[in-house]
Amino acid sequence: MEIYFDNSSTTKISEDVTNEVVFGMKNFYGNPSSLHNLGLKSEKKLKECRETLAKTINAKENEIYFNSGGSEGNNFVLKGILKSGSHFITTPFEHASILNIIKKLEANNVKVTFLKIDKDGKVDLEHLRESITKDTALVSIMHVNNEIGVIQDLEVIGAIVREKSSRAKFHVDAVQGYGKFPIDVNKMNIDFLTVSAHKFHGPKGVGFVYIKKPNTIIPLIEGGSQESGVRAGTQNIPGIMGMTLAAKISNTNIQENYKKVFGIKERFIEKLKSIENIKINSPLSEKFSPYILNVSFKGIKGEVLLHFLEEAEIYVSTGSACSSKEREKLGGSYVLKALDLSKDEIQGGIRFSFSDDNNEEEVDYVIDNLNKGLKFLRRKR
């Protein structure tokens, strides 16, 4: 029995989306930059996809730009906006594609402010208000944290950025939130938004970035005039078609999927009450996404427990797949460290992440194997 509880790393592409990608490969192989009929046919399909995606976030079609996914999108925004002498505001537990750029930014004379967070990982809004200055060029906040699932209040944060500065831009890494929670870029005062298709049952290697004013940013990839000169390179039409269908399905079913996944997390937490020496780092509350459950199993290294579960065909993670090597160097998750957890709690952290493909019955199988694993590993220790 295979149980896949690692949906924050990536999701299984749906059958309908797979068929759409194949259809795109067979029928839209013309280069959309070509002037002949096959090229024009592909160009028209790209326009349709832009229009569909724009509607999901209340944007305009000409504000959607295709790329390879979240990491490229985050690099594009930071490197395209932040110049020498400017000021950047973010949090201490953003995705690696944000945090790993910071040393280079600081070497280029960019001042960086890390916002204070509370015990749950929510941004200290007063600190944000105090931190915005006349030099602030960009505020970058992750919508839903990829390790513990804490949800930031984008509407409030966007309002503060607008109130305090007419110059500062607001960037949202929506990789873990898009398709799971409603997003309105106008209501939330968002200037840049990054999205990755493989987090909502779409294909890997494709995503999009919303840009309110494209003339305010320097391209990351230069070359041809694709994507209105914002991002060079021939567009991945089959991937974009698959992403668009996956986005349409996910956004149409936001409430239904939320309710289903909430039930899975609720059952999981209830069953965990029978297990001793644990700490739930992402409880069942409005502050946290039901799609992510992070638990510290004290006295056990998370990686060891992960491999024990793997033997039973249960697939989980110890945190972000994009930061696994950095986590080894640090001796645990930098996200859990930012929450001031003990060394034992950090090293014993496991992330269970769900999707609408999962069901409550799978929880019982996982709990049974967790009990077996913990008894064996703790006794062995």
Residue ranges and their predicted role:
Residues M1-R381:
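Pyridoxal 5′-phosphate
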